[in-house]
Amino acid sequence: MAYKHILVAVDLSPESQVLVRKAVSMAKPDNAKVSLIHVDVNYSDLYTGLIDVNLGDMQQRISEETRSALKALSADSAYDIQETLSGSGDLGQVLVDAIKKYGIDMVVCGHHQDFWSKLMSSARQLINTVHVDMLIVPLRDDE
């Protein structure tokens, strides 16, 4: 099956390059579009008590760093990246919204095979939320 638009969900770790390379290798034969997305935690939802933190400044700084990292990842891909998207909130819902808005027919994401991922797996959440084809790439520290 030829995909038309592949969305790569990245956490901006060094392993994100592995995911982008996989997506590009799938996209090239059919000249499919490739887009990147990073979903950040909405920090204002985490702080419910009295804390003297300027969340607006922190959120702004994180957004700028995210845009910069996505731009670098896009430039390193050696492929024309269609969109570099950044969102915050629930990972599954943000991806579902992007899938609808941009006509995505394949999602590529990674799965860290470590202790914490057994307890809280983003990939498992996506399997139950996303209704397009998915490629889940196992990520190890040695890659």
Swiss-Prot record:
Where in or outside the cell is it found? Cytoplasm
InterPro entries given in the database record: Rossmann-like_a/b/a_fold, Universal_stress_UspA, UspA
> What interactions and quaternary structure are annotated?
Homodimer.
Sorted UniProt keywords: Cytoplasm
Name of the protein in its database record: Universal stress protein A
What SUPFAM superfamilies would the database entry show?
A: Adenine nucleotide alpha hydrolases-like
- For the keyword Ribosomal protein, the answer is no
**Protein family:** Belongs to the universal stress protein A family.
Keyword match Oxidoreductase: no
Give the superkingdom in one word: Bacteria
- Organism expressing this protein natively: Photorhabdus laumondii subsp. laumondii (strain DSM 15139 / CIP 105565 / TT01)
Give the main localization category.
cytoplasm
Gene symbol here is: uspA
Q: What cellular-component terms does GO give this entry? A: cytoplasm
Q: What is the annotated role of this protein in its UniProt record?
A: Required for resistance to DNA-damaging agents.
